[in-house]
Regions:
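Active-site and donor-binding regions of nucleotide-sugar-utilizing enzymes
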Residues: 1-143, 155-158, 162-163, 265
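Soluble or luminal CAZymes and related metallo-dependent hydrolases
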Residues: 13, 105, 193-203, 296, ...
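Active-site regions of enzymes building and remodeling cell-envelope glycoconjugates
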Residues: 27, 45-48, 69-70, 234-242, ...
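Hydrophobic/aromatic beta-strand patches that form the interior of the parallel beta-sheet core
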Residues: 29, 49, 72, 101-103, ...
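Short acidic active-site motifs
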Residues: 35-39, 245-249, 303
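Donor nucleotide-activated moiety binding/catalytic core segment of transferases
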Residues: 55, 199-202, 218-266, 270-271, ...
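Conserved catalytic-core segment of nucleotide-activated headgroup transferases in glycan assembly
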Residues: 137-232
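Catalytic binding pocket for nucleotide-activated donors in carbohydrate/polymer assembly enzymes
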Residues: 231-236, 263-311
Length: 311
């Protein structure tokens, strides 16, 4: 059984993984995360690959072990920003002892787990991310855009901490973050920076839409964001707010991507799309160095508009 977290983000890659495993004569089940408590015990698989290992799902993992399943983690989040804090809390809580193996996005994460003494070296494997494996294999295929919008500039937002779709409030998000190893004081500092950046992102979009009136802008909220946060942008004739569809189909069909520390910039790089980031909204508390290196960093809206005019 492979647990699927967010279908818009994860289903393509995990389906590819399931296909590869099935070709090796394995029977594979893709199980929605919120149905795993019922479906996994009913299937009683030999192996369960869960999407993360944190306090909220430890009871599930323990039950799978009791029923005789091997349990591994293929973390769909890849890496948290405060990796030192995350692994310290995760390891000190003892929950890593409940699994048989861990599949990481890269060697940094693998080495951190091993160096913390959380799991032995022969139980941790740097496998990469199925989402990017899918892109690597299929990036040359034409993607079908179900909304039939052509020649658009894609703006991907990345502010679920401020604007959660599945939590009742920011306080609940902070509580959830604390449970998975994020320090509360750092979260509160980050929220201040995220709030400023999110409102700046909306202002930026308005300015670009008014400056480049002949361009179509598609604002695609993060899968874990509430899209109503951006409803004021829908008043602009050349701006569309669309959460449906996968990031792959939107990125593959766009003429350029605008983002702020969003991992879809990695996907855009596979498709060799122009990638722009509003440097004036970024801060050290938000910055992801690897993603920054993929992007053209603009110092203001006017500079970004000049770059976009060339596309």
């Amino acid at each position: 059984c492979i647990i699927v977290d967010n279908p818009l983000r994860d289903l393509n890659g995990l389906t590819k993984l399931a296909s590869v495993l099935a070709q090796e004569s394995n029977q594979v089940f893709l199980v929605p995360m919120y149905f795993q408590g019922h479906d996994v015990p009913s299937i009683a698989p030999d192996i369960v690959i869960t999407n993360f290992l944190r306090p909220p799902n430890v009871d599930h993992v323990k039950k799978y072990r009791i029923q005789g399943s091997l349990v591994g983690v293929l973390d769909t989040e890849g890496i948290c920003k405060d990796i030192e804090s995350y692994w310290h809390v995760t390891n000190s809580s003892g929950i890593l002892s409940t699994i048989d193996f861990y599949l990481t996005w890269g060697l940094i994460q693998k080495n951190k787990i091993v160096n913390e003494g959380a799991l032995s070296k022969n139980r941790v494997f740097a496998t990469g991310c199925p989402r990017y494996d899918f892109l690597f294999l299929f990036r040359k295929r034409a993607q079908t855009n179900s909304n039939k919008i052509d020649n658009y500039i894609l703006i991907n937002t990345n502010f679920p901490l401020l604007n959660p779709a599945y939590s009742k409030s920011m306080d609940e998000e902070i509580k959830n973050g604390r449970q998975v190893g994020y320090r509360e004081d750092l979260q509160k500092i980050q929220i201040m920076h995220v709030e400023k950046a999110a409102h700046g992102f909306i202002k930026m979009t308005k300015q670009l839409a008014r400056t480049l009136k002949n361009e179509t802008f598609v604002v695609r909220p993060h899968p874990f964001e509430d899209e109503t946060f951006y409803s004021e942008l829908s008043k602009l004739k050349n701006v569309k707010i669309i959460k449906s569809g996968t990031s792959i189909e939107w990125v593959s069909s766009c003429k350029a991507l605008i983002h702020l520390n969003c991992s879809t910039s990695v996907e855009a790089s596979f498709y060799k799309k122009p990638i722009y980031s509003p440097g004036w909204l970024d801060t050290s508390e938000l910055r992801e160095a690897a993603l920054k290196n993929l992007s053209t960093i603009c110092e203001n809206v006017d500079e970004m508009a000049l770059w976009l005019k060339q596309q």
